């Protein structure tokens, strides 16, 4: 009997579920919780986007507190963990009860947690308007001064608590330290498998992007486009019918549209001034993509209608 309950080796490897949570994991949980609150508030305000502007402004602190209480009800009150902590396999432990066994947060701790988080945020946002309508000589002025001193002391205490958290790795907020709740792992953590596949892929794509940034300016796009056009133009001439002279004069040999400020390079084809000028600037050996004629003097197209000579 004694041997059955004697010293027995641990069956599971890895740290205990009550082992210390990394500082970065605790801070990441706070970031996720803050992002969730902003997302819920933005979705809530979108429901009133077609109402009168500013309709939620008078009761905005109360509405935010109500939404935060709903989140508290289905996270801390139900599971002793926020949404961010649940995503990171973390939950709160009642550190006031000694021992290695996990103890969830007690009901008073949960209610005090809501009061010190949701209630503190609401009071900080609403405190300015609470004393705004009171005259300067009333007792509200003294109360506001005392309140500002208390808020300053609270911020100083939070700063000291955060410095202690950076040193010891426990109780990242003043509320957790006052209530005696500590983040622990929900399940035992196995050995961390480090995989550099994502990092290697990112480095590969960054290197490929830098290579393209260096290579693309060296490629003459205009010359490449003209070469492709000249490559396929003989095929179209063989399969199609012979183009008339009117077609040459009403269609740019480069873009295929109606010529804008028609110019020629010495052959029978007509070009837009921008098309031919940009190609000649990009490639001094530019040739006509239709007939392969070398570029001569770029001149406006001269048309003879009847007995009159018209210059485009």
UniProtKB/Swiss-Prot annotation:
Gene3D superfamilies, sorted: Zinc/RING finger domain, C3HC4 (zinc finger) (3.30.40.10)
InterPro entries documented for this protein: PEX2/10, Pex_N, RING-HC_PEX2, Znf_C3HC4_RING-type, Znf_RING, Znf_RING/FYVE/PHD, Znf_RING_CS
UniProt entry tagged with the keyword ATP-binding: no
Keywords: Membrane, Metal-binding, Peroxisome, Protein transport, Transferase, Transmembrane, Transmembrane helix, Transport, Ubl conjugation pathway, Zinc, Zinc-finger
Main localization, broad class: membrane
Record keyword Ligase present: no
GO biological process terms held by the UniProt record: peroxisome organization; pexophagy; protein import into peroxisome matrix, receptor recycling; protein ubiquitination; response to amino acid starvation
GO molecular function list: ubiquitin protein ligase activity; zinc ion binding
Annotated metabolic or biological route of this protein: Protein modification; protein ubiquitination
Record topology, Cytoplasmic segments: 50-55, 133-141, 220-312
Zinc finger RING-type: from-to: 252-292
Subcellular location: Peroxisome membrane
EC number assigned by the record: 2.3.2.27, 2.3.2.36
Positions annotated to bind Zn(2+) 2: 267, 269, 288, 291
Domain of life: Eukaryota
Catalysed reactions, semicolon-separated: [E2 ubiquitin-conjugating enzyme]-S-ubiquitinyl-L-cysteine + [acceptor protein]-L-cysteine = [E2 ubiquitin-conjugating enzyme]-L-cysteine + [acceptor protein]-S-ubiquitinyl-L-cysteine; S-ubiquitinyl-[E2 ubiquitin-conjugating enzyme]-L-cysteine + [acceptor protein]-L-lysine = [E2 ubiquitin-conjugating enzyme]-L-cysteine + N(6)-ubiquitinyl-[acceptor protein]-L-lysine
Cited function: E3 ubiquitin-protein ligase component of a retrotranslocation channel required for peroxisome organization by mediating export of the PEX5 receptor from peroxisomes to the cytosol, thereby promoting PEX5 recycling. The retrotranslocation channel is composed of PEX2, PEX10 and PEX12; each subunit contributing transmembrane segments that coassemble into an open channel that specifically allows the passage of PEX5 through the peroxisomal membrane. PEX2 also regulates peroxisome organization by acting as a E3 ubiquitin-protein ligase.
Oligomer status and interactors: Component of the PEX2-PEX10-PEX12 retrotranslocation channel.
UniProt family annotation: Belongs to the pex2/pex10/pex12 family.
Name of the protein this chain belongs to: Peroxisome biogenesis factor 2
Species of origin: Danio rerio
